[in-house]
């Protein structure tokens, strides 16, 4: 999944390679620890948030103190870090909140 868009979306989102890897890790962990059905629901929740970020990219605050140009949206136990890129949003990372300092 590299691009996402809903029919009425203003913009779209793109996933970085690191974000794709983060989502694979989330899926594997979720499947093993919470079961496939719950894991799928959580991934759907993340995907809905990505779509919302594409539609309303300024909704969440900038976190320039962590990384210049980044914004952060918390979804469940994960923080979604993204940048606004023209009319699109680039999802940079999807990290557990306790991984932030190590990964950014």
Outline where the language-model segments fall.
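Arg/Lys-rich, positively charged N-terminal/basic patches that mediate binding to nucleic acids
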Residues: 1-41
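Short proline/glycine- and basic residue-enriched helix-capping loop/turn segments at helix->loop/beta transitions
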Residues: 51-55
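Basic/aromatic recognition patch in beta-strand/loop cores that engages polyanionic ligands
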Residues: 58-88
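Enriched for short, Lys/Arg-rich terminal
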Residues: 78-104
